[in-house]
């Protein structure tokens, strides 16, 4: 079997996009996705995204396998790439075009903008311990600057779910964080029963922050859209930033707005096609 695909990237967070509109189940298995994502023996990517038929009054369904074969609820950079991929499939990239996309995190609505930008309505953040989920606090409590012991040190963490779990820590010197070694310690900490994404953040100004991310199931990546959203929510809740903020990641910048009017988080950033190909299974 030969699988046509298009490689996309959003701020260096890269994905293999597959046209799966004719079937409600992914064309390939999680194990096959791992092989495709291998950067030495495969195509190379942080994940494989499938454009499946819509359900529950949506236009499309998004499924994604991470590079380790796990399946996350949603991916912010990935859904921007999916929106551009759908526009290419439909041969309609009109500015302002929106799609209702079913994900495991609920319905997400991306909108095409000029210059290959996509704005995504990421929905409202979830803040309770039971929603993250985490056992760090009671299920009815929020996790705001709560100590978490990792590697013998107490880190003040704020937890947010953007449909997937995030553990945010604010630091004074982002470059000093040994992300490759400490990231997996946070991800697999026993207080996170479904594991967690991990963000370390340095606040530069109330409207500008820098972050590095260890993604659940993917490790260090150049960008994480849901992570950037979670960072702005966490920073605002702890008095560190404005509702509109630029978040700088290793791969570039995202514009994040946590609306006071409707409590929803909006993310704007690029998504670009890299190349097309056919992968033999």
From Swiss-Prot:
Recorded metabolic or biological pathway in which this protein acts: Amino-acid biosynthesis; L-lysine biosynthesis via DAP pathway; DL-2,6-diaminopimelate from LL-2,6-diaminopimelate: step 1/1
Site (Could be important to modulate the pK values of the two catalytic cysteine residues): 166, 215
PROSITE patterns listed in its UniProt record: DAP_EPIMERASE
Pfam family, one: DAP_epimerase
Any single Gene Ontology cellular-component annotation: cytosol
Gene Ontology molecular function: any one: diaminopimelate epimerase activity
Disulfide partners: none
Amino-acid positions noted as binding substrate in the UniProt annotation, renumbered to this chain: 13, 66, 76-77, 164, 197, 215-216, 225-226
Swiss-Prot/TrEMBL GO biological process terms: lysine biosynthetic process via diaminopimelate
Localization terms from the record: Cytoplasm
Keywords, comma-separated and alphabetical: Amino-acid biosynthesis, Cytoplasm, Isomerase, Lysine biosynthesis
Catalytic reactions on record: (2S,6S)-2,6-diaminopimelate = meso-2,6-diaminopimelate
Enzyme nomenclature, EC number: 5.1.1.7
Transmembrane segments: none
Subunit text: Homodimer.
Family note: Belongs to the diaminopimelate epimerase family.
Function, as annotated: Catalyzes the stereoinversion of LL-2,6-diaminopimelate (L,L-DAP) to meso-diaminopimelate (meso-DAP), a precursor of L-lysine and an essential component of the bacterial peptidoglycan.
Protein name: Diaminopimelate epimerase
Gene transcribed to yield this protein: dapF
